[in-house]
């Protein structure tokens, strides 16, 4: 298996300090969750040691579509119906603040170019328009697009433009988080698999393996199951066709074009 596209550019990750003895928190997992956790804790003054079985961002955090999107998996109008208007608004505003914080930390790993969510058919168009109406009613920045430019013209009956979304270079982003965590005082241990909680010299432990079963807490392994998708990257195309991330079929098909004109496309069936 070759090197994943997003990880092909990665520099060495700084190891940070080497803590002796017991640390305040051990973080297991060197993806976006683990590195974010390590950064936040170390910046607050905690002695942190992060363990990664392979290398930083080598899991799902470095192998994905590279989208940075506001909101959750549920359409906003459905979230309003199930959670209530104020709770839904609060959650969506939280994700907007998260994107702002990401922009502060990510540098050139995040480009705020917006995203376009396309309706595959009339049924999905109705779903997207209901979400658009709910977002507009609650004061969120969003635009409805009826006429799409080439090469999309005539293929999709409508779309929502989310202007605050962005395109993410995920491997670079997670490595940048790791570097900031190290600068804040976190110790990073790559190529260090954790086989047992008993071997961790820490007051507290954060399991940040996300979709990958760690075996450390069997109850969690039963609750979280990984699901595989596919992402491919082309050679550079002759021209820029897609200036922002695009996704359709309720998020199961997605693509974007990078500044070097490569097309990165993925999906799940």
Task: Give the residues covered by each predicted segment.
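Extreme N-terminal leader/targeting segments of oxidoreductases
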Residues: 1-25, 43
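Helix-loop-beta segment of a Rossmann-like dinucleotide-binding subdomain
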Residues: 15, 108-119, 147-176, 268
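N-terminal Rossmann-like FAD-binding beta1-loop-alpha1 element of flavoenzymes
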Residues: 23-50
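Glycine-rich nucleotide phosphate-binding loop and flanking beta-alpha elements
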Residues: 34, 195, 212-214
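Glycine-rich FAD pyrophosphate-binding loop
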Residues: 43-63
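Active-site substrate-recognition segment that forms the wall
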Residues: 68, 106-111, 202-269
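Dinucleotide-binding Rossmann-like beta1-alpha1 core, especially the glycine-rich loop
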Residues: 71-147
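Helical element adjacent to the flavin cofactor pocket in flavoenzyme catalytic cores
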Residues: 126-127, 133-138, 156-203, 208
């Amino acid at each position: 298996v070759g090197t994943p596209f997003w990880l092909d550019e990665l520099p060495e990750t700084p190891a940070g300090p080497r803590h002796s003895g017991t640390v305040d928190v051990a973080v297991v997992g060197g993806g976006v969750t683990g590195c974010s956790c390590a950064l936040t804790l170390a910046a607050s003054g905690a002695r942190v040691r992060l363990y990664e079985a392979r290398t930083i961002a080598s899991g799902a955090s470095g192998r994905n579509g590279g989208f940075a999107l506001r909101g959750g998996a549920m359409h906003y109008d459905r979230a309003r119906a199930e959670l209530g208007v104020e709770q839904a608004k609060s959650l969506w505003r939280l994700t907007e603040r998260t994107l702002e914080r990401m922009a502060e930390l990510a540098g050139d790993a995040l480009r705020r170019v917006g995203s376009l969510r396309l309706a595959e058919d009339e049924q999905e168009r109705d779903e997207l328009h209901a979400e658009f109406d709910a977002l507009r009613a609650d004061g969120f920045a969003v635009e409805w697009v009826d006429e799409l430019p080439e090469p999309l013209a005539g293929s999709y009956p409508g779309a929502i433009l989310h202007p605050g979304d962005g395109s993410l270079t995920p491997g670079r982003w997670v490595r940048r988080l790791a570097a900031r965590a190290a600068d804040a005082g976190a110790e990073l241990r790559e190529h260090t698999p954790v086989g047992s909680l008993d071997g961790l010299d820490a007051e507290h432990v954060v399991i940040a393996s996300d979709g990958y079963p760690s075996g450390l807490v069997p109850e969690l392994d039963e609750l979280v199951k990984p699901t595989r998708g596919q992402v491919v990257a082309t050679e550079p195309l002759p021209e820029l066709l897609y200036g922002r991330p695009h996704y359709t079929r309720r998020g199961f098909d997605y693509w974007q074009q990078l500044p070097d004109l490569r097309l990165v496309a993925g999906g799940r069936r």
